[in-house]
Amino acid sequence: MDRHLNRDSAEKILAKKRKLLGRGLSYSEKILFLHEAGRPGEKALIAGRDQIRLYPDRVAMQDATAQMAMLQFMQAQRERTRVEATIHCDHLITADEGAPVDVEKAEGSNREIYDFLSSSAAKYGMGFWGPGSGIIHQVLLENYAAPGGLMIGTDSHTPNAGGLGMLAVGVGGADAAEVMAGLHWEIPFPVLVGVRLSGRLRGWASAKDVIFEMLKRFGVRGGTGRIFEYYGEGAEGLSVTQKATITNMGAEMGTTSSVFVYDESMDAYLRNVGRIEDADYAKTCAEILTQDEICAREPGKVFHEVVEIDLSVIEPTHAGPFTPDRITRVKDFNEVAVREGWPSEISAVLLGSCTNSSYSDLYAAAQVVEEAGNHGLRAKAPFLLSPGSTRIYETIKRDGILDSLVKAGAVILSSACGPCIGQWHRKDIKTGVPNVIFTTFNRNFRARNDGNPETRAFLTSPAVAAALAIAGNTGFNPETDTLEGADGMEFRFSAPQSPPFSEEGLSSFRGNFIPPAEDSVEIEVKIEPQSERIELLPVFERWDGKDFLELPILVKTRGKTTTDHISPGGKWLKYRGHITHISKNLLEGALNAFSGERGRGTNVITGESGVKFFRLAKYYNENTGGFVIIGDENYGEGSSREHAAMSPRFMGAKAVIARSFARIHEANLKKQGILALTFAYHQDYDRIEEHDRVSIVNIAGLTPGKPVKAVIKKRDGSTYEVMLYHALTGEQIEWFKAGSALNAIT
């Protein structure tokens, strides 16, 4: 809750909302209404239809997305950020030799990026967490997340802060820039889903398995446009970092956000990390920071849907490969692996990421490997560990946890994202060789971690991952299987029991952190004139008032098309601040429905085939005035990277027409002035052919809620019409006409 809003004012706002709605309020609604722009309480908003305008308390950016966010903020011509903001350098460090060396290499190879980000942070009054200081979401949880607050972040896993009772939403850089410039932030009023947890986790079951259960039920699209609110006595029994694992991976369901209702575990966590003032403030607002009684008594009157989960029946599970919603119980995995023909040997186990790198997570893993060590066993599989932050690293070092993991064979990587986002210089497996890895990450898309499309990545909990590292075999079940120690004795692992945090408290050492500068008038933002890494953004041209006529189709994608496919990371991360260079990866991983190739298409004008999409886009833009992209279901799933919208815009895309969109990507397309349209009839996707030309007509009549008409011209000259839907508001239509949202405000 915003400290600038006193309790009396908050209660008045909420009382007005209760009267307007004729019922009590959920926790999520309270946070939204207490951050509503304008004069709250005058209109009952319809979920999924109406927009709500909000003023977030905080903006967070990681270094790969902060570059474009800051370049856009600079165009807004403000002297300082209007809200608290931080930049976190966690995405550009490549995992190779280990923590100190990898950070040193990153500081050298990314010097101009770090100079730009640190100088712009200083110039505009933002906090700067330098390379090696921690993964953004763990750092936010430890230092900034607060019950009742509202935060936006330029990373899709920003809802991690929901584990500490904060409503946190992943956005694109344009949203962040506008909020930092003092403007409101607008989203469709979300559909509310209540998740009532009962019971307690048992044995090897973990918070990771709870979110896997949710993914099994809802899939990767079931959360779109929704906020999932977790509550109940089962929720109260989870630690803050367990809660954060669940809210973090709510992003995999496409949610707007996920959040836990404030409880005593949050008070304890805040005090343990040294945030006594925040803990005391939350305690004084405890009556506000909870659901109204109706949520427990008659949840159906508040929530669109109510989900019941008994934690006591949750079992340990794995997710994968290639999608986080393919869930297999650990006890069934060997049978499935044999049937599918997956390799039985584990080629690597990776522990960490923003999802599972807390003290409690690493304590559980250490318990497992210590038990193995007592029998003379070390990890059979290569074992890599990324601590969540400098504070976590110093704490596990102090408490002996680090030593246990290193003795078991763990290589300690920097406190950064590393292999989770493809920043992994992997040397043991050649590209194209089938292999299996287990990770505690949150995503397992094809080729995401190591660039190898034949790597089958499975997600699991830290304790199970540690047991698998020791066993080295994919089918090992730590609940029932035994291992023979070097001492000749057979043993079965004991189920780990880890505390919520260190009793001695979290280390206060923050490492490479620079607080906001108080006097920044004389500070200059550093951009090298001939930089190959940072480039000032062009101003996108305004809509010329004409219809889009007979545009070629750049690609019709088939199946899962994530932002990783549209604008890959890995080797391209270094160009995230250079729109010209980053656009050369356009749709590099997308599967062409016409040819079955990835990243290439046919020039329908010249007849040349196998052309990289960025070259094809350039040709179409220069010779036909642009192009359209056709997408399948949930187009743009995955990370919040706005490059997946900005690059198509830069290369000449006029519209993306899909069966459906992922929330953040659709918002990013709108921000960049691209029409985001969906087929009114899903079967029309199947009718689109490679040589078709697409005309989008009567654009001048574009109106909220009114369908758009497209005319499809076949190769033989015949035509047919297709009805398209859009979700543009009046304000967003003005963005389109202005050429981008940024154009509309500058």
Task: Label the model's feature ranges.
Residues M1-T746:
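Fe-S-dependent hydro-lyases/dehydratases of central metabolism
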